[in-house]
Amino acid sequence: MSGKYRVGIIGCGGMSRNHVNGYLNCGRYEIAALADLNESAMTDMDSRYKLTTNHYTDAREMLAKENLDVVSVCTWHGGHAPWTIAAAAYTPKAILCEKPMADTLGNAEQMLVACRRNGVKLAIAHQRRFLPAYTLAKNLISQGAIGQVQLIQSFGGDGLPNYSSHKTDMYRYLLSDDECEWVMGNIERKTDQYERSTRIEDCALGVFQFKGGARAMLLSDLVPNHYQGAKIFGSDGMLDITTEQVMLLNKETGGKWDLQEPDGKFFKLKELGKRFEWDEGGAGQADELADWIEDKVVHRGNAQNGYKALQMIHAVYESARMHEKVVMPVRTRVNPLDLMVESGHLTPERPGRYDIRAFLLRGERMTSDTE
């Protein structure tokens, strides 16, 4: 394509900034239109990025009028499915939806159907797949640098769907998208806690078995210092990764930790510091989306991978609900945590609904941002 792809954004809160950053930094897009319930959110977006865009408080009007090539869905979780389905009906070339893919597996499956029947490419914004540290670790594992992976250990927080869907996606990416065979997990929920209007647990533990023999263990809200990254234990060595660096220990390193801090395609790590994770990941994600539109590659964040990351999260809830090991795929298409609470199986001991992301809303809104 000789020109730039026209992008429309649905939902102009904090996560949309990562999408806009990515589109602008890779240089292959123009931001044409914004849709949000709050005019000030769109005005702030224009001001922050020096944009001149058309504004809509009705996203369907934007979809009908703007002849968009790409749509970003950046609402809260409950809006991901309805707005992806709505956008697909207007047949853009691609949709980039924030993670987690949806609030239920059934809704995620409807997103897949809507995009498939309309010929629309759908990607889920697990942008850490585009971080050079993660890709370096993936390549070291596939090259046998630590032998057979035996355990991946990671720590999460702020609820499984939001934070830890990045973890389950990371496990699969590090293992070259190996398939998860079964999941065993449990949760504690003594408060009526939500995250972006999605019901979450107070803490959780999940164990994931992969077909290739590796296992992963996730501790969520069980340790004070959670982070994006992992410790990876193999038969012949170890990796300790964060979003910026990879530490390798094996026979070739003389039993000492070897530190690597790889730069990205778009940015150098030392130039951006903590912004590197967001700016490099976002630009890489957007750049590969353009390549996917042009049929040069299959996007590594394609919706099938996003769906499988969500399945693994819901498998933890389903394991807690059924008190059993859950063999994949998960067959319950509603949220198992919702089932537990609404059936009385898991009643909060300390009633009173609260949302840990309510501070992100504008005006009088306290509980929802999905219309």
Where are these regions (language model features)?
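Beta-loop-alpha module in the N-terminal Rossmann-like domain of NAD(P)-dependent dehydrogenases
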Residues: 13, 19, 40-41, 51-115
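Glycine-centered short loops/turns at secondary-structure junctions
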Residues: 91-92, 119, 213, 296, ...
